[in-house]
């Protein structure tokens, strides 16, 4: 009898637990449906007749929703009040959508939340302080949004917080005194000011660029009476009021100072006018030289560096007419100055996403490449800070940055010159009888070299991305060694200047060319691999060749036919013995171009996989290390 009673109680409690779990999962289901119905943009294709744990992006444990990952799926509009009902949620990711408005207040109910990824949206308003009261939060990424106001003072309440990314917003004020031990931190490209707190002085310099900040790891703060390197607004002294006599004295002093300045300017103008009269009289008797710079300026042609020492927008070769000279990072390529660079004979190499490129040849034999940046949207201080970071980057498969020049009208970047030009020109250029096709070994070497360069960039910092990976930015040396160019320039350029021809490489979640990510780089690199193997251009128009949606085209062919059918005929005509390795590299490219960012491999993983392909016995030879 006793055993029957125990059995009955066990069954009773089992059904109680089952009903409880079912009701909790039903509450989660209602919250997810409210989210689906409340957001705009691309609809979430969830099968409402199936259990919510089977829906795309939803992950469950013990019958409850513990993770919701919907990165780059085209959601837009404000988030509804719904997610706070997912009380067992540990991971929430809405990365790289077009969501806007403030964060819903019911986020405060997510007491088990550990990872929050909201970067790459258009969320606005102040960063809610309740995010830092979540007891289990470990990682917060709010980068690349439109958040305003100050960083909440209660950051230290999040005692388990290890990562805080707030870059590329519109935050103002000082950084609060953060005492918790953060492993990753970034507030670059905001409007913050003041001194950097000592506990953050060990963070990389790039974490603070694009603000009015001072102190380690940036330049030291100016010494003043406030003790923190900044002028404290509203600071109280013994008296904030000035006497009437002091005010009168200040007014008289200002008047006298203005009068003196006026007299100085007046005298200088008269002197300059006399000099111009004398100069004009002497010039009247001399022949008038023809200025190719002036002709170029009137023709409204594409920007160029012209050989007589002026750029096409009229920048003079006269050293007195330029504000500053070149800033060098390496001088092993040879000595030259701005005047010499502008006098060098120039040849147009091409017009890219960020500006036009030229081959500059000096009389003494030195040859360099010059990129003339257009639509730079960052101020001079931030431009110089970012270029200093780029100048410190060195890798065998990255084009070396030699020097740069900044003025109001000109932004020039000088790189090493690569004699064989770009991969794009070799793949899609003249295919006449005199052209030597790229064989499998050369293409595999190019893929590996480019992968190593991008992997190196990603290893420097979790927020460092190339941002503009395409075949025209893969340059080749005389020995066909691949070197990647145009790295890390995207955040400085206006997104309106990025043409449609890069769309074929752009990841589906990227809506703003300046808001890039490492996973988006992986997608672009995957397209590059497919381009190498198929010989087809992914851009809308490339050297008069019609472009295709490469990932979709490759997917459609491989689903219906043999994978070998996608390969460039020039690649398979003479090297059928390498077919197995080509298919392996093709699969790497396909995995990189998966629609969902979280499903893509990292660049170190991609590099390792390509290295394994190179070591395969079927390969024509080991790829260079």
Curated annotation (Swiss-Prot):
GO biological process: one example: response to symbiotic fungus
Binding site for ATP: 349-357, 371
Subcellular compartments: Cell membrane
Domain Protein kinase: 343-613
Source species of the chain: Arabidopsis thaliana (Mouse-ear cress)
Name listed for the protein in its UniProt record: Probable inactive receptor kinase At5g16590
Membrane topology label: Single-pass membrane protein
Domain remarks: The protein kinase domain is predicted to be catalytically inactive.
Induction pattern: Transiently up-regulated by the endophytic fungus Piriformospora indica.
Keywords annotated in UniProt: ATP-binding, Cell membrane, Leucine-rich repeat, Membrane, Nucleotide-binding, Phosphoprotein, Receptor, Repeat, Signal, Transmembrane, Transmembrane helix
């Amino acid at each position: 009898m006793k055993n029957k009673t125990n059995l009955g109680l066990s069954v009773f409690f089992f059904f109680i637990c089952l009903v409880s779990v079912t009701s909790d999962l039903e509450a989660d289901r209602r919250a997810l449906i409210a989210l689906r119905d409340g957001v705009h943009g691309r609809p979430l294709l969830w099968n409402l007749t199936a259990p919510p744990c089977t829906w795309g992006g939803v992950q469950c444990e013990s019958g409850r929703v513990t993770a919701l990952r919907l990165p780059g799926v085209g959601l837009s509009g404000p988030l509804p009040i719904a997610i706070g009902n997912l009380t067992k949620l540990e991971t929430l990711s809405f990365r790289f959508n077009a969501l806007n408005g403030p964060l819903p207040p019911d986020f405060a109910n997510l007491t088990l939340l550990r990872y929050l990824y909201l970067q790459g949206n258009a969320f606005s308003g102040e960063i809610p302080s309740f995010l830092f009261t979540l007891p289990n939060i470990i990682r917060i990424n709010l980068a690349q949004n439109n958040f305003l106001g100050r960083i909440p003072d209660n950051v230290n309440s999040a005692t388990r917080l290890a990562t805080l990314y707030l870059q590329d917003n519109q935050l103002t004020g000082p950084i609060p005194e953060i005492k918790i031990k953060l492993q990753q931190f970034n507030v670059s490209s905001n409007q913050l000011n003041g001194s950097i707190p000592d506990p953050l002085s060990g963070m990389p310099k790039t974490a603070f660029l694009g603000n009015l900040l001072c102190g380690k790891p940036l330049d030291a703060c100016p010494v003043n009476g406030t003790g923190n390197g900044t002028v404290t607004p509203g600071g109280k002294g013994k008296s904030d009021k000035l006497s009437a006599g002091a005010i009168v004295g200040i007014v008289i002093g200002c008047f006298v100072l203005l009068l003196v300045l006026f007299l100085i300017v007046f005298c200088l103008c008269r002197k300059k006018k006399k000099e111009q009269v004398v100069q004009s009289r002497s010039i009247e008797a001399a022949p008038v030289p023809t200025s190719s710079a002036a002709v170029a300026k009137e023709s409204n042609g594409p920007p160029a560096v012209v050989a007589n020492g002026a750029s096409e927008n009229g920048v003079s070769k006269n050293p007195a007419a330029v504000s500053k000279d070149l800033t060098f990072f390496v001088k092993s390529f040879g000595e030259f100055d701005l005047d010499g660079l502008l006098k060098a004979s120039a040849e147009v190499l091409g017009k890219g996403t960020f500006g036009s490129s030229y081959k500059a040849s000096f009389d003494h034999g030195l040859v360099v490449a010059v990129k003339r940046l257009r639509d730079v949207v960052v101020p001079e201080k931030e431009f110089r800070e970012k270029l200093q970071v780029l100048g410190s980057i060195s890798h065998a498969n990255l084009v070396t940055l030699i020097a740069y020049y900044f003025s109001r009208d000109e932004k020039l970047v000088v790189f090493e010159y690569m004699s064989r030009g770009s991969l794009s020109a070799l793949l899609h250029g003249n295919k006449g009888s005199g052209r030597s096709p790229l064989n499998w070994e050369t293409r595999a070497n190019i893929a590996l070299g480019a992968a190593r360069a991008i992997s190196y960039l990603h290893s420097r910092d979790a927020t460092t991305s190339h941002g503009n990976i395409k075949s025209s930015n893969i340059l080749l040396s005389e020995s066909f060694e691949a070197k990647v160019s145009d790295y890390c320039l995207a955040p400085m350029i206006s997104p309106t200047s990025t043409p449609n021809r890069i769309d074929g490489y752009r990841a589906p979640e990227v809506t703003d060319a300046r808001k890039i990510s490492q996973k988006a780089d992986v997608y672009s690199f995957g397209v590059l691999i497919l381009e190498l193997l198929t010989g087809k251009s992914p851009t809308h128009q490339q050297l008069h060749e019609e472009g295709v949606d490469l990932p979709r085209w490759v997917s459609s062919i491989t689903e219906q036919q043999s994978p070998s059918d996608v390969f460039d005929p020039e690649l398979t005509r003479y090297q059928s013995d390498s077919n197995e390795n080509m298919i392996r590299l093709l699969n790497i490219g396909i995995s990189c171009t998966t629609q969902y960012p979280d499903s893509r491999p990292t660049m170190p993983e991609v590099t390792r996989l390509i290295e394994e392909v190179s070591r395969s016995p079927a390969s024509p030879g080991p790829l260079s290390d």
